Amino acid sequence: MLKMGVVLFTFLVLFPLATLQLDADQPVERYAENKQGLNPDESREIILSALRQRDCCEQGWCDGGCDCCQ
C-alpha cells in the first residue's frame, strides 16, 4: 500500500510540477512592443549602429571590408 501511495504522489504531484512551464522558464521579451512596429529602414539603422560599435580590425590587417578602416 505504501508503494502505491508513493507512485500516486509521484505521478499526481511531482510529475506535473516537472512538466509545467512557469513564468520564470520563459525567455524575456525586452522592448518587444517597441521594435515590432518599426519599418525596415529603422530596424536596419538599429542593426547597423550596433554593428559599428564592435571593435574593427587592426590597421595593419585591414582588408577594407569594414567601415571603420576607411
Swiss-Prot record:
The lineage of its organism: Eukaryota, Metazoa, Spiralia, Lophotrochozoa, Mollusca. Keywords: Disulfide bond, Secreted, Signal, Toxin. It is found in: Secreted. Expressed by the venom duct. Its main location: secreted. InterPro entries: Conotoxin. It comes from the Eukaryota. This is Conotoxin TsMLKM-02. Belongs to the conotoxin M superfamily. Residues 1-24 form the signal peptide. Disulfide bonds join C56-C68, C57-C66, C62-C69. GO terms for cellular component: extracellular region. One of its GO terms (molecular function) is toxin activity. Residues 25-54 form a propeptide. The cysteine framework is III (CC-C-C-CC). Classified in the M-1 branch, since 1 residue stands between the fourth and the fifth cysteine residues. It comes from Conus tessulatus. The keyword Secreted applies.
